[in-house]
């Protein structure tokens, strides 16, 4: 499932942007989430869940976490939901990564960036390894 679904190596968000997002307070404006522009914001607002805030989007992500749902399946469920509602294809992995890593700060083990194959990513993808991993392991907190 992970090869077709969510993959953090497909994010288009720079490490700097992701780092700023992880360090910032959530304001509630859905476009504050890296990877969400006006088109995705409209899609979220017009979906059956009427997502208009960052808090609602985080709640949607958390709603896919069941008792026997591991981190990879959880991220995939959110990714496939984003696809089903018609969000911009090239930004889905960015949105999943942004929300998952932000929530990982409060809910340890909800996201596991080490579960993805970063060795087989392209050089460009290599720049966007998990910001959570980099900050945690490089002492940038």
Where are the language model's segments positioned?
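C-terminal extensions
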Residues: 1-141
């Amino acid at each position: 499932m992970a090869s077709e679904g969510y993959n953090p190596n497909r994010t288009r968000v720079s490490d700097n942007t992701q780092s700023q997002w992880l360090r910032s307070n959530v304001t509630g404006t859905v476009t504050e989430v890296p990877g969400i522009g006006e088109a995705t914001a409209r899609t979220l607002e017009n979906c059956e869940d009427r997502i208009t805030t960052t808090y609602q989007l985080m709640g949607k992500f958390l709603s896919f976490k069941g008792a026997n749902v591991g981190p990879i399946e959880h991220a995939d469920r959110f990714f496939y939901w984003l696809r089903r509602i018609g969000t911009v294809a090239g930004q889905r992995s960015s949105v999943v990564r942004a929300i998952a890593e932000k929530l990982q700060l409060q809910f340890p083990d909800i996201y596991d960036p080490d579960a993805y194959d970063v060795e087989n990513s392209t050089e460009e993808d290599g720049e966007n390894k998990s910001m959570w991993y980099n900050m945690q392991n490089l002492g940038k907190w």
